[in-house]
């Protein structure tokens, strides 16, 4: 969506742009330049960062509710073999990593404020579509490790777990709350004998995203997903594609 995001910014329009914003991190620099030249607000639509369940997870981790974070684990899968679906069209930027692989990375970064430094990955492509349909990733985040797998030709499942030395946090519908069930954050203690459940019923994360963006445009001090954040997240995705070509660690090139 880089071309039209730049055109809209050059026309003086504020832009809430659907993800994936770009096919590689370098292209996002063009959007940042257009934003700055035209003094407009441009934000990639990562709706999950506006959902209160993710604000709660960030709060719990930062206040030490699970002690020292050691590992983040994620999974996001669905089944789609429709050749006419844009997610299965290579020329339209289809593929599992650009469609849903961005979510385990962006939410881990959102919660921890930490960037992966290096990673290993396995990526499988569909022989007919040419798009990536499965990816398994292991990333070094310094004081903790992140691992996840995503797929477009597996039964529907999604989950995120933040595991510390004093407990762990589980999200049952981390990305599509209301579609596969209401948002719930479950905090387990170290012995897995007690748990606290935080419920987020009829929460409409897309509406919260649109409202936050509108308030920011109106001049209010509201946290919206920045293009700099988009750049960092895309750098992780770019590194995953590179890592798929060999068996060793691949550095995440941060700007």
Predicted regions and their residues:
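A general structural signal for well-ordered alpha-helical segments in protein cores
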Residues: 1, 5, 28, 54, ...
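Beta-strand-loop-alpha-helix segment that lines the small-molecule cofactor/substrate pocket
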Residues: 2-49, 64
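Short glycine/proline- and charge-enriched loop/turn segments
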Residues: 12, 84-92, 188-195
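Basic phosphate/pyrophosphate-binding loop/patch that engages nucleotide-derived ligands
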Residues: 32-41, 55-70, 164, 168
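Predominantly a Rossmann-like dinucleotide-binding segment in NAD(P)-dependent oxidoreductases
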Residues: 48-128, 247
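A short glycine-threonine-serine/GTX helix/turn-capping micro-motif
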Residues: 92-98, 195-204
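Contiguous beta-strand/loop segments that form the cofactor/metal-binding neighborhood of enzyme cores
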Residues: 105-179, 200, 207-221
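C-terminal helix-rich "cap/oligomerization" subdomain common to oxidoreductases
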Residues: 214-255
């Amino acid at each position: 969506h880089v071309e039209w995001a730049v055109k809209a910014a050059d026309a003086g329009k504020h832009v809430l742009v659907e993800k994936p914003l770009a096919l590689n991190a370098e292209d996002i620099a063009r959007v940042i330049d257009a934003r700055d030249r035209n003094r407009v607000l441009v934000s990639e639509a990562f709706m999950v960062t506006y959902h209160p369940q993710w604000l709660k997870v960030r709060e719990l981790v930062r206040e030490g509710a699970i002690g020292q974070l050691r590992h983040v684990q994620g999974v996001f899968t669905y089944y789609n073999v429709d050749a006419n679906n844009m997610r299965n069209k290579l020329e339209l930027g289809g593929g599992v990593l650009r469609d849903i692989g961005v979510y385990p990375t962006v939410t881990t970064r959102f919660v921890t404020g930490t960037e992966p430094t290096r990673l290993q990955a396995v990526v499988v492509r569909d022989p007919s579509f040419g798009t990536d349909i499965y990816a398994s990733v292991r990333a070094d985040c310094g004081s903790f490790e992140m691992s996840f797998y995503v797929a477009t030709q597996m039964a529907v499942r999604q989950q995120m777990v933040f595991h510390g030395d004093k407990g762990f946090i589980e999200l049952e519908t981390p990305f599509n709350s209301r579609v596969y069930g209401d948002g719930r954050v479950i905090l387990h203690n170290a012995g897995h004998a007690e748990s606290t459940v935080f419920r987020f019923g009829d929460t409409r994360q897309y509406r919260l995203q649109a409202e936050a963006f509108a308030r920011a445009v109106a001049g209010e001090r509201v946290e919206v997903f920045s293009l700099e954040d988009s750049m960092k997240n895309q750098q992780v995705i770019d590194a995953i594609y590179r890592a798929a070509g060999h068996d060793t660690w691949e550095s995440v090139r941060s700007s």
